[in-house]
Each structure stands twice: as structure tokens, then as C-alpha cells.
Design a protein with these regions (language model features):
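Serine-hydrolase catalytic-loop signature spanning alpha/beta hydrolases and amidase-signature enzymes
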Residues: 36-44, 55
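A short acidic, amphipathic alpha-helical/loop segment
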Residues: 44-45, 250-253, 279
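Short beta-strand element of the alpha/beta-hydrolase
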Residues: 27-33
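Catalytic histidine-centered segment of alpha/beta-hydrolase-like enzymes
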Residues: 269-277, 281
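Flexible "cap/lid" subdomain of the alpha/beta-hydrolase fold that forms the substrate-access gate
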Residues: 1-9, 13, 17-20, 28, ...
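A short, Lys/Arg-enriched amphipathic alpha-helix followed by its capping loop at the start of a domain
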Residues: 44-53, 93
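Short, conserved structural micro-motifs that define repeat-unit consensus positions
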Residues: 33-39, 61-63
Length: 290
């Protein structure tokens, strides 16, 4: 499904076995997917980016083809701080001591945490369809917040959300794709089938641990950084979908977190790499350079 020009490899970092797609040549570029997807979400933009970059697109720990240990009751093992550190080690193992990172959804949360915790490693940061975790929690009220059901449902104590997610994963995935996008047909049947195949009980465990970490750990890490005035130093591109009204204030939010921010809005909803690749790709290409 991913372009044939990319090689599929596995790398063990700590206790996580990462499935990684690698292709292209040039400056290293790490692409990080979100929920409920895998590296496959990048297949419409990765080939063009690989013309000028060495593109590395892993499945996040526990997602898709990447296996990882069970998380703790508060999501220990799946905090974005821990995930970011593992991926920095992965990039170092591949010979990349500095690199650009582009993240979508949960992957964008790993990406900005990476830029905060490892500023000497990150040359450029692009975040798609998010604001920082603590900012999101502080703004979840009213009608638009109904769309953020995973934040509280999947963070409930085990095993309730794992069982709910595993009971009918097709319904969960279709609901997310159909209600978070402006054009559900953009998430094509082949992609939906691949995401469904990847939604195993093991993956459900990891996803719930990811959301528990968001509730119990990640927002505390964000709160500490905000209180201490710690900001992202890397040039930062933020992109949101025009229909994401709950992110109308995203540019101002990101400018309080990063020193250099370029804010863009493109037609579409939450799944921009698949909904609007023709709009996202030029923005990324210009921002990342050759």
C-alpha cells in the first residue's frame, strides 16, 4: 500500500519494536501519524517529500506494526515524553542526529514534545490539526467538544475502553473518519481496510495507554513547561483544517509556545494528509526546503 520505493524495516528501541518505512534521499524527515491510523496516512505526500528528503515514517509504539509493552495505569510508557525519547534514539540509530519532524494528531503531540525536550535535535517542526495537550483540555467544553470523545472515553481505567474499542473496531474507525473529516470518501476503502486490520486487541491496549498518558502525564508536562516559560525554538509550521472551528485560535496558541510560527489553514477537516494532500504538500515542501 505504501509506495514501493520505500523499504520496510524493523528497529528495536528499548522494549518497542518499531515498524519503519524509509525512502528517498536528502535531509532526514520524520513523519508521525495519529489515531486511529498508521504510517499509511502519509502515502499521498511521502513520495514527493522523498524527492528531497530521507523520509522515515514509523508506526507509533503499539500502533500498527510496532509492538510495545503494556502501559501503566496512568499511561506510563506512553507519555509523549517517553515516545519522543524513543524516536530520537531511533533516528540516532539510523544515523540522524538532527532532523525535521512532521506530526499529525497524536503524532504531532509526540513531535512538539520532541522539540521541547530535544531542541538540539529538531531542525524544523510541523504540527497538523492540533494545539498543545494542556491547551486542548482547557478548551474542551460545549458542542464542538463532542468530537473529542477519545480524550475521556479511552482514558478510562482498563479494561473498559479496551473492550469497547475491540468490540466493534470498524464502527469506531468509520465514526472517526466520517465525522472528523469534511470528505469521508477521502479516506479510501483500501486505507480503511488497512487501518481496521491494524486495530488488534494489542493495538487497542496501546491506544488507550496513549490517551491515559495524555490525561494523566502529558498535560502535566505541558503545564510545567508553560509555567517555566519553556518554548519551542525550532521554526514551527502549524496547519489546521478550515472546518475545525474548535481550532480557530490555534495560531495565537502556538505563538505562545514557539518562537517562530507560520500558521496556515487549508480546506478540510481533521485528516489533512489524506483529505487535502494537494494543499498540505506545497506547505510542507516550502517549509522544509530542499
Amino acid at each position: 500500500m505504501f509506495p514501493d520505493a520505500f523499504d520496510q524495516k524493523h528497529f528495536l528501541v528499548e522494549e518497542t519494536d518499531y515498524l519503519v518505512m524509509i525512502g528517498g534521499a536528502g535531509a532526514p524527515l520524520l513523519l508521525l501519524h495519529g489515531f486511529p491510523q498508521t504510517h499509511l496516512c502519509w502515502d499521498l505526500v511521502a513520495p514527493a517529500l522523498a524527492e528531497n528528503h530521507t523520509v522515515i515514517a514509523p508506526d507509533l509504539g503499539g500502533y500498527g506494526g510496532s509492538t510495545a509493552p503494556m502501559g501503566g495505569p496512568r499511561g506510563e510508557g506512553y507519555s509523549k515524553r517517553e515516545m519522543a525519547a524513543e524516536l530520537v534514539h531511533l533516528m540516532s540509530a539510523l544515523g540522524h542526529d538532527q532532523f525535521a519532524v512532521v506530526g499529525h494528531d497524536r503524532g504531532a503531540r509526540v513531535a512538539y514534545r520532541m522539540a521541547l525536550d530535544h531542541p538540539h535535535k529538531i531542525t524544523r517542526l510541523a504540527v497538523l490539526n492540533i494545539v498543545p495537550t494542556i491547551e486542548q483540555f482547557e478548551r474542551m467544553s460545549g458542542g464542538p467538544s463532542l468530537g473529542y470523545w477519545p480524550w475521556y472515553l479511552l482514558a478510562q481505567p482498563a479494561p473498559l475502553p479496551e473492550r469497547l474499542l475491540s468490540a466493534d473496531p470498524a464502527a469506531v474507525l468509520d465514526h472517526a473518519f466520517d465525522t472528523w473529516s469534511t470528505d469521508p470518501a477521502a479516506i479510501i476503502p483500501e486505507h480503511r481496510a488497512a487501518y481496521l486490520e491494524a486495530m488488534t486487541p494489542r493495538t487497542a491496549d496501546a491506544i488507550c495507554a496513549d490517551y491515559r498518558a495524555g490525561f494523566f502525564l502529558d498535560r502535566d508536562h505541558d503545564a510545567a513547561d508553560r509555567a517555566n516559560g519553556r518554548r519551542i525554538s525550532a521554526p514551527t509550521l502549524m496547519v489546521t483544517g478550515a472546518e475545525e472551528i474548535q481550532l480557530n485560535d490555534a495560531p495565537a496558541i502556538w505563538r505562545s509556545w514557539a518562537a517562530q510560527v507560520s500558521a496556515k489553514r487549508v480546506p478540510g477537516g481533521h485528516f489533512l494528509p489524506e483529505e487535502a494532500p494537494d494543499a498540505v504538500l506545497p506547505l510542507l515542501a516550502q517549509f522544509l526546503g530542499g
